Regions:
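N-terminal signal peptide c-region/cleavage motif recognized by signal peptidases
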Residues: 14-15
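Aromatic-rich peripheral "rim/lid" segments of glycoside hydrolase catalytic domains that contact
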Residues: 314-394
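Short, acidic/polar
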Residues: 38-51, 138-140, 285-288
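Active-site region of glycoside hydrolase catalytic domains
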Residues: 118, 126-274, 283-310, 329-335
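Surface-exposed, active-site-proximal loop segments in enzymatic domains
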Residues: 65-85, 112-132, 169-182, 347-354
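Sec-dependent signal peptide recognition
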Residues: 1-8
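Aromatic-lined substrate-binding rim segments of carbohydrate-active enzymes
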Residues: 44-116, 137, 193-208, 214, ...
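Boundary/entry segment of secreted carbohydrate-active catalytic domains
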Residues: 20-44
């Protein structure tokens, strides 16, 4: 047993010695990418990503076929060790990304004690924020994963947890005054996301000194909650925010034709509308800018790692164009959501023209258990061209 422990320590030390210290240099200039959150690994995806010209992809692999209950984790109820079969599939995808010149941000939607809602019978799993034993399991999961992936050339960042929301677990929907009072009371408790992020960075750094780490903040990485985020003492950390919304405007099933950017933006959940300019949209990220200035976080350590607007809704092209302009003006990294998503959720597949519906052959293929991807009517359209232009090589 002692021999095995010493051998393991020696292996980790040797691996650390050959880990790539230059990975942070990737982020020293603005990077533009896309999200990939599919139900399986598809090698042809990376070929298409190369042809588009993506700098990087943010992969969320939780829905990939898992040997156990939860991909890579095994069982989010009680993590013990990385599942080797799942890890082999992930490495296969990373190899494919590298062959096509696409760098990878690896993101988990599930962690021990925080199983992704869509894989949990549509129930939010908040155990991570109420019991520190799950913190320890989450840290151990990422220690093991980082030790195995730190030398892979495709990996340019770990994003340990997508859209954390301990706030919601305790009944908060917005960073209001009641939340501010609660925030003060929960310091150094399991609900303290900032402490969780600090300890997560420390855990990863115990096995991997060099790979950048991207941290999501409160309220599903909301830009408006950035005043409650705290920086970590690590010069290879980036701070992420997601879609500025308003959510009820950009979401198809909620919008129902009521709202459109920039002329009919909701002032409240079901309230009246108002017109926005690009400057008004930029105000949604004011707390991000203030965080950057207050803590001396340079622009190349800020990342808008998800933004979207359902293609079927009026205003999608104007919204996406204005957000990209805002991010580019500030030299923030960004990744649109999403590129060539598989399955029947096609509202965020911008290569499909805004008014285009899926044909009968598409639905027939799904009914027959066949691959419907070749039947998606992707093609040139004004919305897609807004994104496509961003990846043209100068």
């Amino acid at each position: 047993m002692i021999f095995r422990i010493l051998l393991s320590v020696a292996f980790l030390s040797a691996s650390s010695a050959i880990a790539d210290p230059s990975k942070i240099a990737f982020w020293n200039t603005q990077r533009k990418g896309a999200n990939q959150q599919n139900a399986q690994h598809r090698p042809e995806w990376y070929v298409a990503a190369r042809e588009l010209g993506l700098d990087y992809v943010r992969i969320l692999p939780d829905a990939w076929p898992a040997e156990g209950r939860d991909f890579l984790i095994g069982n989010a109820d009680n993590f013990e060790a990385i599942n080797e079969t799942d890890l082999s599939l992930l490495i296969e995808a990373l190899d494919e990304a590298e062959r096509n010149g696409i760098k990878v941000v690896l993101t988990m939607v599930s962690l021990p004690g925080a199983r992704w809602k869509q894989l949990n019978n549509d129930r939010d799993d908040a155990r991570l924020w109420k019991d520190k034993k799950y913190h320890l399991q989450a840290f151990e999961f990422w220690r093991q994963l980082a030790a195995r992936l730190k030398t892979h050339p495709a990996i340019v960042a770990y994003n340990p947890l997508n859209e954390p929301h301990p706030d919601k677990a305790f009944g908060f929907d917005a960073p209001d005054e009641k939340f501010a009072q609660w925030f003060k009371r929960i310091q150094n408790t399991p609900a303290d996301l900032n402490q969780f992020n600090r300890e997560m960075v420390k855990a990863i750094r115990s096995v991997d000194a060099h790979t950048p780490i991207i941290l999501d903040g409160w309220f599903y990485a909301s830009p408006r909650a950035f005043e409650y985020n705290r920086p970590v003492d690590d010069d290879k950390v980036l701070y992420a925010f997601h879609n500025p919304g308003p959510w009820q405007m950009v979401t198809y099933r909620v919008n129902q034709g009521r709202y459109a950017y920039p002329d009919r933006v909701p002032k409240s959940w079901n309230g009246p509308t108002e017109s926005w300019t690009i400057d008004r949209l930029a105000q949604q990220m004011h707390a991000v800018q203030k965080f950057s200035e207050q803590y001396n976080i340079p622009a190349h350590r800020i990342i808008a790692s998800e933004f979207w607007y359902d293609r079927r809704l009026e205003g999608a092209a104007a919204y996406m164009a204005d957000l990209i302009e805002i991010y580019n003006q500030r030299n923030w990294h960004w990744a649109f959501y999403a590129f060539r998503g598989t399955g029947t959720w096609t509202g965020l597949d911008y290569e499909i023209p805004p008014g285009q519906k899926m044909g009968w052959r598409y639905w027939q293929a799904i009914e027959q258990g066949k691959d419907p991807e070749p039947l998606k009517p992707r093609g040139p359209n004004p919305l897609w061209e807004i994104l496509q232009r961003q990846f043209e090589r100068k």
